[in-house]
């Protein structure tokens, strides 16, 4: 992602190649990896979303060991999950850590399970907030 995909995209497509114009989001296992990579590389990503993040998601203190830095760098941190999703606890523990450390984020719990109906809605809502100047 960092060494191959981003350089390829920046070389072959007309994109603005800086962190303020780069987002990362995913669902389920991809949601966990989006949080892991996005929050672990705040010099590369400013907009991060995890939808129904899976057990591969790092523990919150590992995800964000320096909350003060994150407060300055994150433009949007989106955490969402269905209220009947068996993985809800992963999103909740991440949300709780962000609240405890006063890291700005959006937590969205909605009716639903671990399925595409929930994720389509999450992506739609998340996308409305991307690259918006505050």
Predicted regions and their residues:
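Non-catalytic cap/lid and distal C-terminal segments of serine-dependent acyl enzymes
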Residues: 1-134
């Amino acid at each position: 992602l960092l060494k191959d995909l981003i350089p390829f995209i920046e070389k072959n497509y007309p994109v603005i190649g800086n962190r303020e114009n780069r987002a990362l989001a995913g669902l389920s296992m991809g949601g966990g990896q989006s949080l892991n990579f996005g929050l672990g590389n705040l010099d590369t990503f400013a907009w991060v979303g995890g939808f129904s993040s899976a057990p591969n998601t790092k523990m919150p203190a590992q995800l964000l060991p320096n909350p003060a830095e994150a407060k300055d760098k994150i433009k949007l941190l989106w955490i969402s999950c269905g209220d009947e999703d068996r993985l809800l606890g992963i999103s909740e523990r991440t949300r709780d850590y962000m609240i405890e450390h006063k890291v700005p984020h959006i937590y969205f719990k909605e009716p639903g399970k671990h399925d595409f109906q929930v994720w389509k809605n999450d992506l739609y809502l998340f996308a409305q907030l991307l690259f918006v100047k505050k």
